[in-house]
Amino acid sequence: MITITILKRLLKLIVVIPILFILGILLLDFFPEVEHDYTSTKNDVVLSNSLSGDDAYSTKLSVSDDGSLTIKRNLKSNDKPNNTNRAWTILVYLCGSDLESEDGCATLDINEMAEATASDDYIYVVQTGGTNSWDNDYISSDSIQRLSISNGKVTVLQELEAQNMGEADTLANFLAWGVENFPATNTGLVLWNHGGGSIYGVCYDENFDDDSLTLKELDQAFTMASPYVDNKLEFVGFDACLMSSIETANILVPHANYMVASQETESAYGWDYTAIGNYLAEYPNCNGAELGATICDSFYASAEVSDEDYESTLSCVDLSKVDTLMDSLNLFYSDLYDATTDSTTLAEVSRSVSEVLNFGGNNSTEGYTNLIDLGGMVSSLSEYSNYSDTVLQSLNDCVVYSRYGEDRQGSTGLSILYPLTSFDDYEYTILKDVCVSPYYMSYIDRLSYANANGGNLNGYSNDVWSIFWNNDDSSQMDYWLESGDSMVLLSEQPYLDDDGYYCFTINSDSLDYTQTIYCNVMQYIDDTNVYDLGTDDYVYIDWNSGQVTDGFDGMWYSLADGQPLSTYLVEQNDDYNIYSVPVLLNGEYTYLRVQYSYPDGTTKILGAWDGIQDNGLSSRDTYSLQAGDTIVPIYDCYIDQGDYYDYSDYSYGTEYTYKGDGNDVLLGVLPKGDYCYSFIIYDIFGQSTYSDYVIFSVDEDGQVYY
């Protein structure tokens, strides 16, 4: 029997209309039986919305004058009996958003739930909302609806007035109602939607300006529902991007035993709910860790089917071990804070952190999540603290199971917020609310001060960290919102040497502040208009002398029809480079992810990804291209003003039909014409500086002349 999981990926992989029609007919067999029963469940309980101050939350972190961390939690017990024969209730907070209105992903997951093995030992209970249209005829986008899914049947239980799925009250009411009406030995909660990481949270409601549940609002929701939830939830899961962070785990400790979440972005099709139900039918006495491992394995297997596993991640975290991890982290960051009192050491630390595995893009082309791997950060800075091994062991104890793809080797299961680019005032405020260590906040504060003052720490107050924890007035930290001049100074300005290479030299005192150097290439379309062709690493750097030389040989990426592409380097290691390419794909703006492999010199399109929006909403789907898809290159256009290039607009190339034969994107010699080349110098604070451009020409034989 072909499962919904396989079919939904086949629908994505096959584009020939007659075959799609046949598959659509086959899919009718999997539409679940639907009935309406508005009398079998109780109405919402009346939740207290009068909680304020510390009472509105279940976790409170405080710090003493010596910087030691105190964690106060309103912990629930796990020993209250449930008078029920049901082993598991899985509550699903299904905030459909554009994932449903554009692709029907939420409906497909409901179908997956209905297709799972029939059993009275478990039940799915779903609240729907958050989207402007549903891909079925039994759910309305004008209201909140509640469903039960069991033994192959969907039962519509309640229809309520429209509510914002991005508000704490909405989640709290569903949680309290679900637990009261569907008691079980174990209850799990899945938050289904887009994820925006530790800053922006989860569950963006398409009908309410994409409002989302921040981590603070999640804590509020659980705290409001707490009087009606006798025991801890066995797990809280995020079928969403970017939510497996230490900040998220800290919020969930009082409310659940386990967390299941991804450090990286997820495929739009996410978890395999048929596999989850099948496992619960066979092993109803499983605990959260055992079910969490199954969720991870089935998610990864589904990603493999659709060829989206290369950067997939999913982790199961034991929340009872988080406090020990946080205590050891605070000691580690205390050492790090003490070690970075001078600009040189701070620069060394920042440069090390910049090399740590990060998640969700984190580049100027696609947007920033500012999430890096927690274990990777601690490992990279082990020389600065005697507690690094303790932290890594505690982290290993927390993450009881994880799966990750080839391109995310080395991920340790939990991320942490880190300013890969300067925070704005909103991000700063949220960081203050969710940061898990006063000394880590102090380190970030010192880093922000240095960023605003050109790397200089003169005048920095070592006592300022107490403001973050003991005072709501943050006016003294205005420098968080500033960016100073780059600390990278040149002892020799760019010039053409006798061999025709473009060169410059970094001042020896600035080398520690230099993260990396790329090149930028632009193409002259006529005498004054140029297209930006992107960035690459055609640069040789001598980190001892500071000498930098161009390594450009006239090679660039293009479509098979010869159109150069705007390719922006977003990830590099010893084995491959990954580029982001702005295009219209079937008429929709997105970014192609293109990988160049060094061992065999091959280039392939990994998929398309829509990037990170300004509100932190991360596209869930890195989706595969299919033969027959149309690609139109997009270029940023500039006007040559003589001594600078002035941005004018963007321009489109011509339509290209994707073949899928492995030769759609090629690395080859640029077409004959005039171009310009510049160095881009990135410092450790995330700032970039462009050198002067030098004009070069490519002749009909592919030779480059400056």
What residue spans do the PLM features occupy?
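N-terminal Sec-pathway targeting helices
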Residues: 1-19
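Sec-dependent signal peptide cleavage junction
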Residues: 24-41
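Terminal, contiguous helix-loop blocks that mediate binding/assembly
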Residues: 37-83, 197, 203-238, 243-706
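N-terminal extension/subdomain marker
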Residues: 38-183
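Structural recognition of the beta-strand scaffold that forms the well-ordered cores
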Residues: 89-94, 123-128, 187-191, 234-238, ...
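Residue-level signal for short, function-critical loop segments
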Residues: 96-97, 130, 193-195, 420-422
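Catalytic-core segments of thiol-dependent peptidases
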Residues: 128-231, 240-241, 246, 263-264
